[in-house]
């Protein structure tokens, strides 16, 4: 019995250009991304820092394609899980051409990293477009609240006064004062 292989690609990189969106005859969206990943190392002989950038062709289909076309821009950092696919076509002069792409279908993943407004801006941004600034020292005696990096600011009123036991409540801290 022949065993199945594994075809899974995971990339974290930055877009080299805005997403290119097309629509299939059935109305489904298709987006092409040009994704750069970089490796850095130190040359053992010279001690110089070296960097190599690889460019990856990424294709997204369906709802992920629509989201990518709306929110991603040149410079956006993105996490991709997909599969390698090689396709063949014939160009206008009759020459057969091949290209290998990372295809992200319904079983794949595309996750935006670095916040909504981080792409293309000259200023380093924190999650959700908030500039990173050191926290002001707290003098209240209470421990400072910890906010994970990619969460929106807590500037809205909470209508839910409690959460049932057994449910995790992200972004909330419970203090018992006696």
From Swiss-Prot:
It holds the Pfam family SSB. It comes from the Bacteria. Residues 111-161 are annotated as: Disordered. InterPro entries: NA-bd_OB-fold, Primosome_PriB/ssb, ssDNA-bd. GO terms for cellular component: nucleoid. Residues 55-61 bind DNA. One of its GO terms (biological process) is DNA replication. This is Single-stranded DNA-binding protein 2. The lineage of its organism: Bacteria, Pseudomonadati, Pseudomonadota, Gammaproteobacteria, Enterobacterales.
């Amino acid at each position: 019995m022949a065993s199945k292989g594994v075809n899974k690609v995971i990339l974290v990189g930055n877009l080299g250009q805005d997403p290119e969106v097309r629509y299939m005859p059935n109305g489904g969206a298709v987006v092409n991304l040009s994704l750069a990943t970089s490796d850095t190392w130190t040359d053992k002989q010279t001690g110089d820092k070296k960097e190599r950038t690889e460019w990856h062709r990424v294709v997204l289909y369906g709802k992920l394609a629509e989201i990518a076309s709306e929110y991603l821009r040149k410079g956006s950092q993105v996490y991709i899980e997909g599969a390698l696919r090689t396709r063949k076509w014939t160009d206008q002069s009759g020459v057969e051409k091949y290209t290998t792409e990372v295809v992200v279908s319904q079983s794949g993943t595309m996750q935006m990293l670095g916040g909504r407004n981080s792409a293309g801006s000259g200023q380093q941004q924190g999650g959700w477009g908030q500039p990173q600034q050191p926290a002001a020292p707290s003098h209240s005696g209470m421990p400072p609240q910890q906010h994970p990096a990619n969460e929106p600011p807590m500037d809205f009123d909470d209508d839910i006064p409690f959460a049932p036991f057994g449910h995790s409540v992200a972004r909330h801290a419970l203090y018992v004062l006696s």
